[in-house]
Amino acid sequence: RPFLSKEFPEAAMVSEWGEPDKSLQAGFDMDFLLHFGPSHYNDLFRCEEPYFSSRGKGSAAAFVEKYKESRKKAGETGLICIPSGNHDMDRLARTLHGDELKVAFAFLLTMPGAPFIYYGDEIGLRYVENLVSVEGGYNRTGSRSPMQWNHSVNFGFSNASPEKLYIPTDDKPNSPTVEDQMADPASLYYEVKKLIALRRVHSALLSDGDIEFVSDGADGAPLAYIRSSADEKILVIINPADKEAVLEVPGIWNESLYTVGGTVKAENGKRIISPKSANVLR
């Protein structure tokens, strides 16, 4: 790392350990959480009852506890990153759908660390079921299908004969494309763009901003945290469940910077949080 920092100061080393409290101390600039190991990352998106499912039966508490522990151990040596997915995981859209994906991205793009968006997750690209394994992909093969740009041959990915593609496209009805989502202001694609723009203009939401959890999302409860920098403090409240929630939050947060799925109302010193919503307040 000293050599890289000296010779290529704008480069960064990213590990694939999934244990940032170890990898950052070993010299990497950043590490991203994985679907195995001690992080409880799967509790959020990829388990029988993920926290971001609108059924509201999941819990983020174990993830939050381990995340705080990892940040404490890592100190300021590097970034702990939370990816939307990668080539070894089930697609995010295999377990989450519609508004659930929008709320999940609100979390991913307001947390510390460098955002990692696996290609296609920003349009809800689906896991392609029942594919023959390609070069040792096995059940991971369905997460490696081509990007889908439009409705031309092979969804705009290639003009080759479909049978010559390395992995087939998702040919089922309502298969998402970039073209369709760019034409729809209510699409997941546009929501992700809004969140990226929000992150870029608020120092508290940048990769190295601090975080303090107000609610750990235990047993389907809202997940709430305060992001802060030297210039500002921002409150993020996330309620993936399909029912209204009530939360006590310290401080005065009157300015809405972002909302999806419904707003947060102040009432008798508490916050009334809309179902399937994410809100960013200042």
Predicted segment positions?
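Generic detection of short hydrophobic beta-strand segments and adjacent strand-loop junctions
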Residues: 147, 245-249, 271-273
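Extracellular glycoside hydrolase catalytic/binding regions
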Residues: 43-48
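C-terminal beta-strand-rich structural cap/linker in extracellular carbohydrate-active enzymes
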Residues: 265-282
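Loop/helix patches that line or flank the sugar-binding groove of alpha-linked glycan CAZymes
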Residues: 4-12, 18-19, 23-27, 31-35, ...
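A conserved amphipathic helix/loop scaffold
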Residues: 237-238, 264
